[in-house]
Amino acid sequence: KYCLGTVGLLDKCTFRFSQWDPANPNNKYEGTKEQWDEAQRVMGQILDDLDVKYEIGIDEAAFYGPKLDIQYKNVFGKEDTLVTIQIDMLLAQRFGMYYIDENGEKALPYIIHRTSLGCYERTLAYLIEEYAGALPTWMAPEQVRFLPVTDRAADYCADAAKALESQGFRVEVDYRNEKIGKKIRDAQMEKVPYMVVVGDR
């Protein structure tokens, strides 16, 4: 929730607790009913403890365990999964993994698959789509572009750009031999948040 909130997506997402279909357990799911019941109970308890508002999706689980799917709708209204957190009941067994429990016995762990922001490419694509390319300043790959009107202003722009870069800003200088109107138009088309026009005055 923190990561989604940081990039401004939390309020645009819905949470789906994807569970197995107990009426058809042999169709695509592996593991026992007891394993599924326990995994879903634990995941549901965690979500409730964290005050996550979710809807239940029956028959939406992975074949190896329940999951929390964080969904969003793209500009065409199609729902996609942005982030997923999954409980894997099978992987540890297949790799021969175990831990020693409180009784000194070997016990089988469950593996949790998770990411903070899901697939980065998909998240970035959604952000570009959501903001129509005009990303928030803190997220923009280029935050400031200096536009010298004449060659005489280029040295000043270079010094000013270095000063901003030393403070952590992402800065470019447009040194092209083009009219200032074209430089401004190009920066607008490329969604640069801040343009600094520097001339003799």
Walk through the language-model features, giving the residues of each:
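NTP/phosphate- and nucleic-acid-binding module
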Residues: 1-201
